Curated annotation (Swiss-Prot):
Its EC number is 3.5.4.29. This is GTP cyclohydrolase III. The lineage of its organism: Archaea, Methanobacteriati, Methanobacteriota, Stenosarchaea group, Halobacteria. The gene is gch3. Signal peptide: none annotated. Coiled coil: none annotated.
Length: 253
């Protein structure tokens, strides 16, 4: 059974900060957000986790293996590098969606995202080392079948983007509501999903649903391990097996 540790990352009082003392240039805000994501990706990635940008002012990380001290150090590093601070909330559950729900509730209980007095909150209890297993995290790595041939080499970039995003949006909704899983677009034609130990039939159903609904064909490699990065690398290798053997779903062997 999976046991996913999810950390919600939220920039403190970000909306008001972007317009104080007057509205800040959008290009500067986009630069800050992208740099913060890059730094968090490295800070969490160096500890075998994954972070997904979602809306940039709110990000979702899979942090199995990171304890409370590691979270506090990440907070401190952000505070030292940026004119903004971040709050972190940790949830744990076999269901990634439920884990994120717990993390969200804890942070909302601490105050509004736009409360200037609510800064650098750190809440939640990470998984104890004695409770960790080699099957805690299931990562599924989806990509679009022949995205280059169907879209990149045939359509203008915006129309290609629309097709890829339609596939992502439909998969994201389906996986959330049918499988309690969290799916994230990670660039190109790639989607990474954090899943609740679902089986091959469930992945096939998801792929069929997306194809029937928006006409985007997908394949997926699935990995299972004790950290997000280890499971993610296993999923990438399984996806290569899909390409080599022309299959829709492969689990890491």
């Amino acid at each position: 059974m999976t046991n996913t540790q999810v950390t919600l990352v939220q920039i403190d009082n970000y909306g008001p900060w972007t317009v104080t003392p007057e509205p800040r240039r959008e290009v500067d805000l986009q630069t800050l957000q992208s740099r913060l994501y890059a730094d968090l990706s490295q800070l969490i990635g160096n500890r075998m986790g994954y972070v997904f940008f979602t809306r940039f002012d709110n990000m979702v990380a899979v942090t199995n293996g990171l304890d409370a001290d590691a979270h506090a150090l990440i907070q401190e590093s952000v505070g030292n590098r940026y004119p903004v601070t971040v709050s972190l909330s940790i949830g744990v559950d076999s269901s990634p969606a439920a884990a994120l729900g717990t993390a969200t509730d804890q942070l909302q209980d601490a105050g509004s995202a736009q409360d200037k007095g609510r800064t650098e909150i750190l809440r939640g209890d990470p998984i104890q080392p004695s409770e960790r297993t080699d099957t805690d995290v299931q990562i599924a790595h989806f990509d679009v079948n022949d995205a280059t041939g169907k879209y990149t080499d045939q359509l203008n970039e915006f129309d290609s983007f629309i097709n890829i995003e339609q596939g992502y949006a439909e998969l994201m909704r389906y996986m959330r509501h049918e499988n309690d899983s969290l799916s994230f677009f990670v660039g190109g034609d790639n989607i990474i999903a954090v899943c609740d130990g679902i089986d091959e039939a469930a992945y096939l159903d998801a792929i069929e649903h997306v194809n029937e609904t928006v006409g985007v064909e997908l394949k997926v490699g699935v990995g299972l391990d004790r950290t997000a990065q280890a499971a993610g690398m296993a999923a990438k290798h399984a996806l290569e097996t899909c390409r080599e053997e022309n299959t829709d779903v492969e689990f890491a062997r």
